């Protein structure tokens, strides 16, 4: 090893040790229910194989951008290793693989003991390696995935393309919208079998709230637009017919669908990558730090975790090409830490910049009596309002309430220009973020104007006490930015200063996908960017 490379690797080991102490020296679970978890979901307790010491390419993360990258690399003949900190959860039509939003246990959350969601109802449980990581920063809670398949396991399934004019406003010409519209959005729609909610599902009992939502927005002068969705409608039909346990028709989604109702990445991109024989996913592999040697080879410090959080081993892996797909938070943490500690010394001044929440806000308004039992999960429709600040509202379900309350929930996405910067804390080895409380209030206010207009014209109640707030912008499920295209990277995700290093996920997006859910755009950009990378 070259002298410089030796010291860099030694530095990486020190950084990884500090990070392991900070991040998750997650305590081993003391949950007596772990024995039950082992009987319910034995698959996640199977021995975890070690990732190979060296691979042509390593992909960190297994969400939308990472999964696209793994498949397209494999198809190009490039052997790749996918590293995922979370477990690989199976699906079954009858077993309760995942916990519910209403009375969750440790399977729901990544090594935490309490959670207060959008309903503002506090819940407690014992720590375990569950699927949803709630990362708390000053001013904002960020929801992100910890499972093989990433966000596709826990999101609500809506995959919508933004309008060109708003997309261009956000991306500033770095990405050609026409190219996405003509090539990459259609490719993703085909790969993920996206389509609108069928009429029989829409008119079923669990979607009475969707029909009432549409009636109210029409009364207010809006025309609801149908959403494309990743749900497999035949699985919902099985639920309605009683030939599968209720999940997507019974307010379950944020913590996973046991019966595989969502056509998540384990059923498409990751599966297809594995079937090439040139890509393998390694669950329980948390990446703590990254470096580049003088030779150009990359070093990845990894901790292998049991579902309980116990660290089973630590190793340094190497690769020729390194693709970051750990999501806005995970990718930004790795890059900011590497820049601060000198393991990637040539990163530019834009690393850590451009974080935004996609303008997320959850709203609730009342309704007249709804003839239904519980709320179905898939979002049937949306409206867009440009009368002031551009806002999209989507028909949503109320997480954690499996019965019908008469409330109608919306997920709002506001065109919010606010951006924040990730910073490194040398004393702890952690990476932090400050989010403005004033921004929270502004986002909530912009969405509230639209929701109140609907409530007023539909004769509904705008303030709904069961949710604690009529508008809650204290969280985001759509973190974006931190390594933005055209700034920290070139226009295709190649990281400036470190050839062979790429950003392939939501960290590359400048804080917003222009008032729609980010998943379709993240996936389409990954398709576009990996195609350019492979061209050379």
Residue ranges of model-derived segments:
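C-terminal segment of N-terminal export signals and the immediately downstream linker at the start
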Residues: 1, 21-56, 75, 90, ...
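N-terminal export signals
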Residues: 5-27
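N-terminal Rossmann-like FAD-binding beta1-loop-alpha1 element of flavoenzymes
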Residues: 57-81
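Glycine-rich loop(s) and the adjacent beta-strand/alpha-helix scaffold that form part
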Residues: 75, 79, 85-100, 290, ...
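Redox-cofactor-proximal catalytic regions of oxidoreductases
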Residues: 102-199, 409-418
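FAD cofactor-binding and catalytic pocket of flavoenzymes
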Residues: 125-144, 151, 155, 169, ...
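Conserved redox-cofactor binding core of oxidoreductases
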Residues: 173-286, 472-479, 484
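A conserved short coil-to-beta-strand element within the FAD-binding core of flavoproteins
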Residues: 283-296
């Amino acid at each position: 090893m070259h002298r410089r490379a030796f010291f860099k690797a030694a530095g990486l080991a020190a950084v990884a040790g500090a990070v392991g102490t900070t991040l998750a020296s997650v305590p081993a679970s003391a949950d007596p229910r772990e024995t039950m978890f082992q009987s319910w979901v034995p698959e996640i307790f199977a021995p975890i194989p070690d990732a190979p010491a060296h691979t042509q390419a390593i992909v960190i993360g297994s969400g939308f951008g990472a999964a696209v990258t793994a498949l397209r690399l494999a198809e190009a003949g490039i052997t790749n290793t996918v590293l995922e900190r979370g477990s690989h959860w199976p699906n079954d039509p009858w077993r309760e693989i995942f916990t519910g939003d209403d009375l969750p246990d440790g399977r729901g959350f990544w090594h935490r003991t309490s959670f207060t969601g959008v309903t503002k109802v506090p819940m407690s449980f014992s720590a375990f390696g569950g699927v949803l990581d709630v990362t708390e920063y000053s001013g904002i809670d960020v929801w992100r995935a910890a499972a093989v398949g990433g966000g596709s396991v826990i999101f609500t399934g809506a995959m919508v393309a933004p309008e060109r004019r708003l997309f261009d406003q956000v991306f500033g010409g770095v990405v050609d919208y026409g190219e996405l519209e003509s090539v990459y959005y259609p490719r993703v729609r085909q790969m993920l079998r996206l389509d609108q909610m069928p009429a029989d599902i829409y008119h079923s009992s669990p979607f009475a709230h969707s029909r009432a939502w549409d009636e109210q927005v029409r009364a207010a002068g809006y025309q609801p637009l149908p959403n494309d969705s990743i749900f497999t409608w035949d699985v919902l039909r099985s639920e309605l017919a009683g030939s599968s346990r209720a999940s997507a028709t019974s307010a379950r989604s944020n913590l996973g669908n046991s019966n595989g109702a969502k056509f998540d990445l384990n059923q498409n991109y990751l599966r297809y990558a594995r079937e090439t024989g040139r890509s393998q996913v390694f669950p329980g592999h948390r990446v703590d730090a990254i470096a580049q040697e003088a030779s150009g080879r990359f070093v990845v410090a990894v901790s292998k975790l049991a579902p309980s959080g116990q660290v089973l081993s630590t190793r340094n892996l190497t690769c020729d090409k390194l693709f970051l797909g750990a999501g806005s938070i995970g990718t930004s943490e790795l890059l900011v830490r590497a820049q601060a500690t000198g393991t990637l010394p040539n990163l530019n001044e834009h690393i850590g910049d451009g974080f935004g929440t996609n303008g997320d806000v959850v709203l609730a308004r009342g309704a007249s009596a709804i003839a239904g039992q519980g709320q179905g999960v898939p979002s049937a429709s949306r409206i867009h309002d440009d009368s002031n600040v551009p806002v999209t509202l989507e028909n949503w379900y109320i997480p954690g309430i499996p019965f019908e309350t008469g409330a109608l929930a919306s997920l709002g996405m506001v065109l919010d220009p606010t951006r924040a910067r990730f910073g490194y804390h040398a004393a702890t080895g952690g990476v932090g973020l400050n989010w403005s409380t004033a921004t929270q209030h502004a986002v909530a206010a912009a969405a509230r104007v639209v929701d109140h207009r609907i409530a007023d014209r539909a004769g509904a109640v705008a303030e709904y006490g069961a949710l604690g707030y009529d508008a809650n912008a204290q969280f985001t499920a759509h973190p974006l930015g931190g390594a933005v295209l055209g700034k920290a990277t070139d226009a295709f995700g190649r990281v400036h200063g470190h050839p062979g290093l790429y950003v392939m996920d939501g960290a590359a997006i400048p804080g917003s996908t222009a008032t729609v859910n980010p998943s379709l755009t993240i996936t389409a950009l990954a398709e576009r960017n990996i195609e350019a990378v492979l061209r050379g």
